Regions:
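Membrane-interfacial loop-to-helix junctions in multi-pass transporters
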Residues: 3-7, 73-80, 108-122, 155-161, ...
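Membrane-interface alpha-helices at helix entry/exit sites of multi-pass transporters
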Residues: 104, 113-122, 152-166, 193-199, ...
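Interfacial loop-to-helix junctions that mark the boundaries of transmembrane helices
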Residues: 1-5, 22-24, 53-58, 65-78, ...
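Hydrophobic alpha-helical transmembrane segments of multi-pass integral membrane proteins
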Residues: 82-85, 111-147, 316-320, 343-381, ...
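Alpha-helical transmembrane segments and, especially, the helix-loop junctions at the ends
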Residues: 127-144, 149, 154-194, 211-215, ...
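Short amphipathic alpha-helical coupling elements at transmembrane boundaries
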Residues: 70, 101-111, 150-154, 297-308, ...
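Long, contiguous bundles of hydrophobic transmembrane helices that form the permeation core
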Residues: 2-14, 18, 31-38, 42, ...
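Core transmembrane alpha-helical segments of multi-pass membrane transporters/permeases
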Residues: 32, 52-100, 271, 275-334
Length: 461
């Protein structure tokens, strides 16, 4: 009975939050209120408000405020600062004319490609490869927004389509060494090499190709439906005094991430890399004119870009975190797990139920990790009791959690991308929805073809 009540409370609050955001209310305010309501109800029901890793203040009422403080410190101190630095860097690149120079140089070879959608797909594949270097979905999305997004928009790709491309790469796990893959391999009771390279990687590549094709047709359909015209920026209209080599500057963070990964050079945090990139740009600006005042004034533009990112993106991430914690403490995720365990032992039915529940949990909480980590614990037990191959359950669940995050209006990557693109999170979700559904279907079909469903097929083979 309690499971039904917890699910009902979660669904009612989710519907209420969605309704007010769609009506145009501040997403930050609505998510804060929704999260606080859930946390208060959780406290009244006797649930612990703070995560297990945090120490209680001794009073439930102050624990709620304490969690907001924890989020403010963690979001602002690490992820938030990274977002602010990237937004400040992007603003500085525009100010010094580096972004204009990228468009000016790129437009010459790109003019031979008539369709902006082909350029968009090329950008998507590049972004997917970047996911091998940047494991954080939000971090990758923000990095792409600061580098690829301005280029895509300026060569004729609509803002919505470009934002969807930046939000999509982490929807499918490509890296064979990510924490999620390691955990899934353990649950699947397979060696990591076999699980990651022989099974998961081919399924991931198939899903990425399918999503790329879906992006091409879906973004084109939405642009036509919304009467969005694609006009390549006239190169003659671009007036910049920046030298041609400045076109490399917007991409220095990507180059830095690839170089300073611990293999080619020292392993540096992306914020450290961004500081180096901004210092490099500032030094070049000084060498160009030997005008210290102009250099310092230009850096002020970067600082204002950081401030705008705090107000528009970081606080929205904090609010989304409060909402996700509210759903977790109310018992919403645990209720979904209880539903999954109540289904029969037919392999395809159990797999589909787990995939749907994992995806729903990811969509409502905005987290790709939390639902998968919650569900993956029960895979070995479920698999053995039902005579099912654990890998048959873990692979689609692994991908479903990340796909669900990509169509969650409260996920960090969607919120950050929408904030930087200055569009609604629901617009990003609409743009990513069909590619995500296509990706999920391919994952399910490929798993059915490539992974034996019965555990006897594994042990007997």
């Amino acid at each position: 009975m309690l499971t039904v009540i917890e699910l009902l409370i979660g669904v009612v609050v989710i519907v209420g939050v969605a309704r007010y955001i769609i009506k145009g209310y501040s997403a930050t305010g609505v998510l804060f209120v929704g999260g606080l309501v859930l946390l208060i109800i959780s406290a009244l029901m006797g649930h612990k408000v703070l995560p297990a890793s945090e120490t209680s203040t001794g009073y439930t009422a102050t624990d709620i405020v304490e969690y907001i403080k924890i989020l403010l410190m963690s979001r602002d101190g690490d992820l938030g600062m990274m977002i602010m630095m990237l937004c400040g860097f992007a603003a500085y690149m525009t100010h010094i004319g580096a972004n204009d120079m990228v468009v000016k140089l790129a437009s010459k070879p790109l003019q031979y490609i008539n369709s902006p959608y082909l350029l968009m797909i090329a950008a998507y594949f590049v972004a997917c490869l970047m996911s091998l270097a940047v494991s954080s979905a939000t971090g990758l999305g923000v990095l792409l927004m600061a580098t690829l997004f301005p280029v895509m928009v300026n060569v004729g790709i609509s803002r919505g389509a470009a934002a969807a491309i930046c939000a999509s790469p982490a929807a499918i796990i490509l890296s064979p060494t990510s924490g999620d893959v390691v955990l899934a391999a353990k649950a699947a009771e397979m060696p990591l090499i076999d699980f990651a390279f022989k099974t998961t990687l081919p399924i991931s590549i198939a899903a990425i190709i399918g999503m790329a094709i879906a992006h091409f047709f879906w973004q084109r359909y939405l642009d036509k439906k919304e009467n969005i015209s694609h006009e390549m920026l006239d190169v003659a209209e671009i007036t910049t005094t920046a030298p041609a080599f400045y076109a490399l500057l917007p991409f220095t963070p990507i180059i830095g991430v690839l170089i300073f990964d611990g293999k080619w050079g020292p392993q540096l945090h992306i914020i450290t890399i961004l500081v180096i990139c901004m210092l490099l740009a500032a030094v070049l600006e000084f060498v160009r004119g030997f005008n210290t005042q102009n250099v310092f004034s230009g850096l002020e533009v970067a600082y204002r870009g950081m401030a705008d990112a705090f107000a528009g993106v970081v606080m929205l991430l904090v609010a989304a975190g409060v909402f996700a914690q509210g759903l977790s403490t109310i018992g919403f995720i645990q209720s979904l797990i209880s539903i999954a365990t109540s289904f029969g032992s037919a392999s395809i039915i159990l797999m589909l139920v787990l995939v749907i529940l994992t995806m729903l949990a990811a969509m409502t909480t905005g987290s790709g990790n939390a639902p998968f980590y919650a569900f993956v614990e029960m895979i070995p037990k479920l698999a053995h009791s039902s005579g099912i191959n654990p890998a048959y359950l873990s692979i689609p669940m692994l991908q479903a959690s990340n796909l669900g995050r990509t169509i969650s209006p409260v996920s960090g990557v969607v919120v950050a991308v929408a904030g930087m693109a200055k569009i609604s999170p629901f617009e990003v979700v609409k743009r990513t929805s069909v590619p995500v559904i296509v990706g999920l279907l391919i994952v399910i079909i490929a798993t059915e073809i490539m992974v034996p469903g019965a555990s006897s097929a594994v042990t007997g083979g």
